[in-house]
Amino acid sequence: MELTPREKDKLLIFTAALLAERRRARGLKLNYPEAVALITAAIMEGARDGRTVAELMHEGTTVLSRDDVMDGVAEMIPEIQVEATFPDGTKLVTVHHPIV
């Protein structure tokens, strides 16, 4: 199977997000890479589902709360930018303060 670098990145993000979901389900607090992967994957999947950039900017702030992450992680992520593929092309989605 031949994958482009972008496809490899998407697969890596999805894998990290899946691991984060499992750890969260077990009651573990997520670390920085897990939190970023989970929020990023939610945005990418939302774009694939046809949601708008504005909807995803809001949804990105609801994926995780401070209770879901280790101490200090929320402060380490002032914003997340995701280049997501929408039905009408690729767009940049920026989520400010994704963990509140």
Swiss-Prot record:
Pathway: Nitrogen metabolism; urea degradation; CO(2) and NH(3) from urea (urease route): step 1/1. Gene3D superfamilies: Urease, gamma-like subunit. Its EC number is 3.5.1.5. It catalyses: urea + 2 H2O + H(+) = hydrogencarbonate + 2 NH4(+). Keywords: Cytoplasm, Hydrolase. GO terms for cellular component: cytoplasm. It is an enzyme of class 3 (hydrolase). It is found in: Cytoplasm. It comes from the Bacteria. GO terms for biological process: urea catabolic process. GO terms for molecular function: nickel cation binding; urease activity. Belongs to the urease gamma subunit family. Heterotrimer of UreA (gamma), UreB (beta) and UreC (alpha) subunits. Three heterotrimers associate to form the active enzyme. This is Urease subunit gamma. It comes from Cupriavidus pinatubonensis (strain JMP 134 / LMG 1197).
